[in-house]
Each structure stands twice: as structure tokens, then as C-alpha cells.
Swiss-Prot record:
This is 3-isopropylmalate dehydratase small subunit. The gene is leuD. GO terms for biological process: L-leucine biosynthetic process. Belongs to the LeuD family. LeuD type 1 subfamily. Its EC number is 4.2.1.33. Heterodimer of LeuC and LeuD. GO terms for molecular function: 3-isopropylmalate dehydratase activity.
Amino acid sequence: MEAFTKHTGRAVPLRRSNVDTDQIIPAHWLKKVTRDGFEDGLFEAWRKDPEFVLNRPEREGATVLVAGPDFGTGSSREHAVWALQNYGFKTVVSSRFADIFRGNSLKNGLLTVVLDQKTVDALWELVERDPQAEITVDLEAREVRAEGVTASFELDENSRWRLLNGLDDISITLQNEADIAAYEAKRPSFKPQTVQV
């Protein structure tokens, strides 16, 4: 997992609330379990509309999604996180996220930033007025900065530490690989074993 310390990028203003995971990526995209190749499924139904915000040329290459409240509701699917990342988003800003989506995001390296709705509105206005405006999300300082906007955000210490160090569940486990191997070597042969394939 790539470490996240600070990111500056242009933004997509997604003025929709209650965006569920099926809208983020429809169920027919969930047949594979690799983490890549989901960018075309991101907001698939909405992208059929030529006026949808992601279809606008001035939004191409944007890396910050500024979403409406209750983003990521619905069923738990890591594919929704992977689709956002595959498209190029490094962080999502909203006034409220579904708990399971937020947990999946943080465990997969996508920083979800909760700001009050007034601040989200100010970011929307800024990036709609100037599509080239950049937003900085600084995890070290726990701050979002843009022209005319400076806002602090909270994130639990464990999630912050994992993101700053680029650590997912597997990489954290592998930090103890020698201890795991030593333990397995001493286990009686009649007990179940893990075997590298």
C-alpha cells in the first residue's frame, strides 16, 4: 500500500447525497478480486450522461473527490474503494461517510476526510468556479487547505499511522513473519499447519 502523507490535486465536485456502493460500482463488476481494472465501472450508470461531472474535460486528471453527505452507504464492497483508486482519486472529502465504506477505504489506502457541510460547500463553490483550483489534504497536519479554506479534520491514531506508513493488514502481519515461522516450526506435526504454495 502506498503511504499517504500529503496530497495536492484538482477536485471533482460530486453534489449528490446518499451515494451508495452500487452507484459507485455496480454489482456486475464484482466478479474479480484483483484490485485493478475497475476505473470504467466507477459511477458507470451516471457516466452514460455526457453532462455528468466526471465526463467534463476540465475534470480529467482530478485526484480529490468532494462528495455529498452519506457517501458510501449500502453494501460492503472493497471494489467501490478500488474503483475510486483505479480512476485516480487519492482522497474523498465529505461531511459524512458510511462506517463500513470508511473502514474499507482506510484499510485500502484511500483517505476519507470528514469536514463539516459548510466547509464542503465552500470547496464545491471553489472548484466549480475554478476547475483548476487545487485542494491540499495534509494527513501529517490533519488539515485541508484550498484558496479561502483551511479546515482541520480528525482521524483515529491507528488509521493515521497505517496511512502515513503505507501499511495494510497483510504488511502489518508480515512484520512478524520471523516470529510466525518460528512458532509454526515448533508446532506438533498432528496440528494444522500453514504451508506456502
